[in-house]
Amino acid sequence: MTNTASTLRTAVPLDELIAAARELRIGGRWERATRLLDSGEATDPRSRALLALAAAEVALESDWFGGTALAEPRLAAAGLFVEVLLASLDGKPADEAQSDIRWDLDFLRLRHGYLGQVRVDGVFRVGPDGRDPDAPAALRTHAERLRGEAPDGVRRGWAEMYLGLVADNLFAERDVAPGHYEAALCAGEAGEAGGTGEAGGSHNSGDDLLVREALRHLGDHDHDHGDHARARERWSRATELGARAGTVPGTLSQQVLLAVLTRDAGDEAGAVAMVREIARWAGAIGAMTTEAQARGFLAGVDPTAPPAPAESDS
């Protein structure tokens, strides 16, 4: 008897395919999400652009959590497909959906640029010292432009979120960042539905992820100011929202912050036991950056330590 392999092809609505890949991406199943998207066949420029954008976002999150280097070629490919889409309009004005696609691509480029600044040779590096000042300034300008061009409130909220991250982690402007996080929080809680990408897809989980991210960083500022009760409130809610949205690696990284509060309260044994499990779980799913953060905590590193301000030349 000879076994023969056959490939079964079936038609699936594009929105459902991308939504399924999005759930896999958020859950940390980046390879499976990529294979699913790459298996899709599309014949029109818009569908090809949407598939390429979704694949680029999977690659970007794999780079962030898994320490891979996959996003750059995926972003380049997505850029080409978006160019083809815009060229296909042949002078006709772009509709709202196509404007959303262009914004989403630009936002992925912002996120990739930010990652390149805070992750250097595999190490998370914050603060302005030893950094070309033009690069953070360009990211800030990029995020400001995205905020101004955002087609809806959730996307505007994500631009605000990255303005806060750039201020916090690249410029060490700790007094500036919270205002951006508060604006992001308001946008996420308002619940305007976005399109594709981090700000869109499933209405609830898209909003949940933005609210989670804002609460995560606002809680960090609460912690720095010694308001541990407020930090716990925000971090606990962020953990809950992340779990509801299905972000497995993000929820693990959030639990590390809760362990910081356990350590602050004097329960070192409890904090260590908690983070030891987080490190094990993160390693099991390939979330290498979260595992490294957890192992740093076990070695005594404070993951909430603020970046140092720029040293004066005087």
What are these regions (language model features)?
Residues 1-21, 25-28, 255, 260-314:
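C-terminal non-catalytic interaction modules
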Residues 22-38, 63-91, 126-143, 170-182, ...:
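Helix-turn-helix repeat elements of alpha-solenoid scaffolds
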Residues 7, 41-46, 96, 147-152, ...:
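Short coil/turn linkers that connect adjacent helices within long alpha-helical scaffolds
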Residues 20, 55, 59-62, 109, ...:
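Structural register within alpha-helical repeat arrays
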Residues 27, 62, 116, 170-171, ...:
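Structural motif corresponding to the intra-repeat A-B loop/turn of tetratricopeptide repeats
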Residues 159-179, 183-191, 204-250:
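Alpha-helical adaptor scaffolds
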Residues 15, 50-57, 104, 109-111, ...:
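Residue register of alpha-helical TPR repeats
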